Regions:
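Post-signal peptide N-terminal segment of mature Sec-exported envelope proteins
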Residues: 22-46
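Long, amphipathic, charge-rich alpha-helical segments that form helical bundles/coiled-coils
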Residues: 60-108
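N-terminal Sec signal peptide cleavage junction
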Residues: 15-16
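Long, low-complexity or tandemly repetitive, helically biased scaffold regions used
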Residues: 36-39, 89, 93, 129
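C-terminal partner/receptor-binding element of secreted or periplasmic proteins
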Residues: 103-129
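Amphipathic alpha-helix face/heptad-repeat signature
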Residues: 23, 27-30, 53, 80, ...
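Membrane-proximal N-terminal soluble sensing/regulatory segments of transmembrane proteins
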Residues: 44-55, 59
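Sec-dependent signal peptide recognition
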Residues: 1-10
């Protein structure tokens, strides 16, 4: 009897895995990573750390933008991805020119953090089917 129950449960679980999901874990995870990086107040303390972090945020934002653009029914998120990528590129390029103050760094990271907070909320609850 236990074997029969185990077989039925495993078949049900395997069947559930075949149903499409509206939640995209890959996109969501990358947005959360950007959110975490932008929330760290210590990032702007040194130029080297801020530059490295801004480059990492830009790489993640570029991935999210390219990935999101390749999906169907994702136009609104793709616009948010484009804005996030523009903000992150601006910060990264400023560090490339050496023109960044701590105040600017914190303000830009705060804007990125707020944008990703909105994106997290949207990506967690939207259907994409």
């Amino acid at each position: 009897m236990k074997l029969l129950v185990a077989c039925v449960v495993s078949m049900i679980l395997a069947g559930c895995a075949m149903l499409p999901s509206s939640f995209d874990a890959q996109e969501h995870a990358r947005i959360v990573t950007i959110n975490q990086l932008s929330a760290d107040n210590r990032v702007c303390a040194t130029r080297e750390l801020a530059q490295t972090t801004s480059q990492e945020i830009t790489r993640e934002a570029d991935w999210v933008h390219r990935y999101g653009a390749s999906l169907g029914n994702n136009e609104k998120m793709t616009r948010m991805h484009a804005n996030l990528l523009a903000m992150s590129r601006e910060l990264s390029e400023r560090y490339g020119r050496g023109e960044v103050s701590v105040v600017y760094c914190r303000a830009k990271l705060d804007n990125i953090h707020k944008a990703t907070q909105t994106m997290i909320g949207v990506s967690a609850r939207r259907p994409r089917l």
